[in-house]
Amino acid sequence: EGSVKVDGFDILEEPEEVKKRIGYMPEFPPLYLDMTVQEYLNFVSDIKKIDRVTKKRSMEKIMDLVKIGDVRKRLIKNLSKGYRQRVGLAQALIGAPPVLILDEPTVGLDPKQIIEIRNLIKDLGKEHTIILSSHILPEVSAVCERVLIINKGKIVASDTPENLSKRLGDT
């Protein structure tokens, strides 16, 4: 029982307002492979009804932030897995949502790309609430300040990564 609010908006009473405040990157971002990076991000901006002035201003910032500006004119199908993940993250950032939900953001990346994406997530955590879904415990420890373990829909543990490691290591 209870209610869930995002940025002060109840998810049942004002779902459209809630959706505007959440950016989501699934494990396998649904990218249009025959679009360039810039075309795809413009397409997502249009879907999210971002006005032209805001779109132009924020697009450069987002591409710089996730380090994809140098591939903006390349077709997505010609990008590495790491760059595709960055494009997926960029689309989640469109509209400046205060909450980001990232599902297994480093799956399939090489070690260098994993470090880069983890550092990017930590940086994003300074300005966004990030909900990270991961089964990779070293990743959780590397990027999270707080961890919730959910089993069958129930929160079974909530603490810092360090404290959880100590508690779970002792059992």
Q: What label would you give each PLM region?
A:
Residues 94-98:
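A short, proline-enriched helix->beta-strand linker immediately N-terminal to the Walker B motif
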Residues 100-104:
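Catalytic Walker B motif of ABC-type/P-loop ATPase nucleotide-binding domains
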Residues 75-79:
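Conserved ABC ATPase signature
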Residues 42, 46, 53-71:
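Conserved ABC ATPase "signature" region
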Residues 158-159:
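ABC ATPase "signature
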Residues 2-10, 17-18:
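Conserved ABC transporter NBD signature motif
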Residues 114-126:
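Helical segment within the ABC ATPase nucleotide-binding domain
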